[in-house]
From Swiss-Prot:
This is Probable phosphatase Spea_1436. Its EC number is 3.1.3.-. Gene3D superfamilies: Metal-dependent hydrolases. One of its GO terms (cellular component) is cytosol. Zn(2+) 3 binds at E74, H102, H132. Zn(2+) 1 binds at H8, H10, E74, D193. Binds 3 Zn(2+) ions per subunit. Keywords: Hydrolase, Metal-binding, Zinc. Pfam families: PHP. One of its GO terms (biological process) is bacterial-type flagellum-dependent swarming motility. Its cofactor is Zn(2+). InterPro entries: Phosphatase_YcdX_put, PHP_dom, PHP_phosphatase, Pol/His_phosphatase_N, Pol/histidinol_Pase-like.
Length: 249
């Protein structure tokens, strides 16, 4: 199956990434990607863009050259309370909010602490997708996190980059997560976690996890732009009607 949606990308606004937004748009057009989210790292990361970068995402057109662009962030989970580094009314101006553990912000601790932080973040209502929860540096109670995510309509990510250049050893955890989310009745999403435009929409390894878990396609948010937009609308994000022209094509 060809997946037309990517929820996790980084531009040169995060200085360890290497492509501009315009290069992503061109690559999306080339690959047939209909909708992607620009989700640079939250401001607590050392090389992340300033807080105002995310506030000013409102200047971005919703659709450029037939490609839909979601205004987003990959926020950092800061502590066991589940707080993230983007807050207040500004969250409501974003189309999509991702959050995950990153070592410069939240040092690896223990299974109980990681699990509590993720569940508290999920229950906060501020985050739509938890990124790379299969990271072996942050062991979690997978069943408990999957249950909390399902109960709060939050998706867990199968991160394709985890199998390539980072977070080595994630395969076992990601398969367990896919199976647990399936059992809990929750949602999954595949994210490229692209740091260069060439990787946009590359879910090669993540797809293998989805297939091995026999995960139901109707609960995979990448299955269509309509599916992702319906999820985000249900999560309370407004202004998504501006993508109607995209859905008509």
């Amino acid at each position: 199956m060809k997946y037309l949606v990517d929820t996790h990308t980084h531009t040169i606004a995060s200085t360890h990434a290497y492509s501009t937004l315009q290069e992503y748009i061109a690559m999306a057009k080339h690959k047939g990607i209909k909708l992607f989210a620009t989700t640079d790292h939250g401001p607590d990361m050392a090389d992340a863009p300033h807080f105002w970068h995310f506030v000013n995402l409102r200047v971005l057109p919703r659709i450029v050259d037939g490609v839909g662009i979601l205004r987003g962030i990959e926020a950092n989970i800061k502590n066991v309370v589940g707080e993230i580094d983007f807050f207040g009314d500004y969250l409501q101006e974003l189309d999509i909010v991702l959050a995950g553990f990153h070592e410069p912000v939240f040092a690896p601790s223990n299974k109980e602490t990681h699990t509590a932080a993720l569940i508290n973040c999920i229950m906060s209502g501020h985050v739509d997708i938890i990124t790379h929860p299969g990271n072996p540096a942050y062991p979690i109670d997978i069943a408990a996190v999957a249950k909390a995510a399902a109960e709060n309509n939050v998706a867990l990510e199968i991160n394709n980059s985890s199998f390539l250049t980072s977070r080595k050893g994630s395969e076992h955890n990601c398969l367990a997560i896919a199976k647990a989310v399936k059992e809990a009745g929750g949602l999954l999403v595949m994210g490229s976690d692209s740091h260069v435009a060439y990787s946009l929409g590359d879910f090669t390894q993540a797809e293998q996890i989805i297939e091995q878990a026999d995960f139901p396609i109707e609960r995979l948010l990448n299955r269509s732009p309509e599916a992702l937009l319906a999820f985000l609308s249900a999560r309370g994000h407004g202004s998504l009607d501006e993508y109607s022209a995209l859905l008509e094509n």
